């Protein structure tokens, strides 16, 4: 697959929305994860854009979870959401 600015922009947009790179790479529109990492090794600007998009994506996920927490849940759903929130919060602390 050939790297293009349009493809990289779509990749960045999806990362900003909180989608994991592994999920995005399964989409036929995108190359596999190893190809994306290869591009990043060769292109410092792309690498920086992707890292910033991933940081933004974590904040997007925090916002989504904060929204979800406003809706009443069963105890089991609450436990799952709490675990998910803890993981996202941990990611945010590592990327900050």
Where in the sequence are the language-model features?
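Charged, helical or coil segments that form electrostatic protein-protein
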Residues: 4-5, 9, 13-88, 92-96
């Amino acid at each position: 697959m050939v790297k293009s600015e349009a493809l990289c922009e779509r990749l960045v947009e999806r990362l900003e929305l909180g989608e994991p790179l592994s999920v995005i790479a399964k989409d036929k529109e995108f190359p596999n994860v190893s190809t994306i990492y290869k591009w990043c090794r060769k292109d410092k600007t792309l690498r920086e854009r992707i890292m910033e998009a991933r940081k933004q994506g974590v904040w997007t996920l925090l916002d989504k979870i904060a929204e979800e927490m406003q809706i009443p849940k069963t105890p089991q759903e609450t436990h799952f959401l709490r675990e998910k929130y803890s993981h996202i919060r941990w990611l945010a602390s590592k990327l900050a």
